[in-house]
Amino acid sequence: MARRPRNSRAWHFVLSAARRDADARAVALAGSTNWGYDSDGQHSDSDSDPEYSTLPPSIPSAVPVTGESFCDCAGQSEASFCSSLHSAHRGRDCRCGEEDEYFDWVWDDLNKSSATLLSCDNRKVSFHMEYSCGTAAIRGTKELGEGQHFWEIKMTSPVYGTDMMVGIGTSDVDLDKYRHTFCSLLGRDEDSWGLSYTGLLHHKGDKTSFSSRFGQGSIIGVHLDTWHGTLTFFKNRKCIGVAATKLQNKRFYPMVCSTAARSSMKVTRSCASATSLQYLCCHRLRQLRPDSGDTLEGLPLPPGLKQVLHNKLGWVLSMSCSRRKAPVSDPQAATSAHPSSREPRPCQRKRCRRT
């Protein structure tokens, strides 16, 4: 087959039409007539955009992921059957998993893409308020240096489209670089790591099968341990696995990105602690009692000490340290990847344990 010219604008419009047709079929299957979702048929201004060398995205990418919510609240699994994306989450403000009142950091209003809007004291970020023409991203207000850092991101809207991701990145990541390109922004280079809602882990442009998919209502936890140099992901407060190692002496920002129109995410927890003997003891206690609702319950400790530990290290005492069985990779997510990129391979993950 003859190879088409890379910079042909005619091909851009041909592929745009094909993508619009694929998206229209996807909406018909989803039972929706007025979706404002991230359609890869939106035209990009980039002539040399490598994303246009792919085939039209698979139909399921336009259908929100359901059945992966942290709770059973009404509205967390109905998005794909609503007639409008706006009505899908209007009036259904679920607060499950949002117990914390103090936050170590929130989203940074000065370091974000133009297609983002902050609310809820800068803890909630909304992407592409009307329609989407690319990828929007944002980072936290605090650079994460030495110590233990843990945060949770709740998916507060339908999760669908080219990609919605949670991860970390250095200050070198350009958050507005792909504002006219639909892509998986986090993990495209060596400066960032990103977990996609499809279950793929991205880093240096490589993709590995890492977890099951997540959707509206899912809570994605991230633990950056600069003492051991590890990055660990959690889903609905269950450990998925260690995504990266050898991260000592590096500094990162928490980041998220989305290509989906009218999508949103919310910081429900952001904590930090020094790597002290107190932290290591609490972490070890949690490992020894992984299924206990209250790790300190029944232990011969003074009530005052228990309260202090809960206030300072409650996130450690509630953290799941047992790794779930690795799920089977989603073949639909793999087929929508860039054909010239490497195929997703099984991720060799370490157990969520500390020595």
UniProtKB/Swiss-Prot annotation:
Substrate-recognition component of the ECS(SPSB3) complex, composed of SPSB3, CUL5, ELOB, ELOC and RNF7/RBX2. Interacts with MET. Residues 85-274 form the B30.2/SPRY domain. Its main location: nucleus. The keyword Ion transport does not apply. Pathway: Protein modification; protein ubiquitination. InterPro entries: B30.2/SPRY (IPR001870), B30.2/SPRY_sf (IPR043136), ConA-like_dom_sf (IPR013320), FBXO45-Fsn/SPSB_families (IPR050672), SOCS_box (IPR001496), SPRY_dom (IPR003877), SPRY_SPSB3 (IPR035754). It holds the Pfam family SPRY. The gene is SPSB3. Belongs to the SPSB family. GO terms for biological process: negative regulation of cGAS/STING signaling pathway; negative regulation of epithelial to mesenchymal transition; proteasome-mediated ubiquitin-dependent protein catabolic process; protein K48-linked ubiquitination. GO terms for molecular function: ubiquitin-like ligase-substrate adaptor activity. This is SPRY domain-containing SOCS box protein 3. Residues 37-56, 327-355 are annotated as: Disordered. Substrate-recognition component of a cullin-5-RING E3 ubiquitin-protein ligase complex (ECS complex, also named CRL5 complex), which mediates the ubiquitination and subsequent proteasomal degradation of target proteins, such as CGAS and SNAI1. The ECS(SPSB3) complex catalyzes 'Lys-48'-linked ubiquitination of nuclear CGAS in cycling cells, leading to its degradation. Recognizes and binds nucleosome-bound CGAS: ubiquitination and degradation of nuclear CGAS during G1 and G2 phases is required to promote low intranuclear CGAS abundance before the next mitotic cycle. The keyword Transferase does not apply. PANTHER family: SPRY DOMAIN CONTAINING SOCS BOX PROTEIN (PTHR12245), SPRY DOMAIN-CONTAINING SOCS BOX PROTEIN 3 (PTHR12245:SF5). Residues 264-315 form the SOCS box domain.
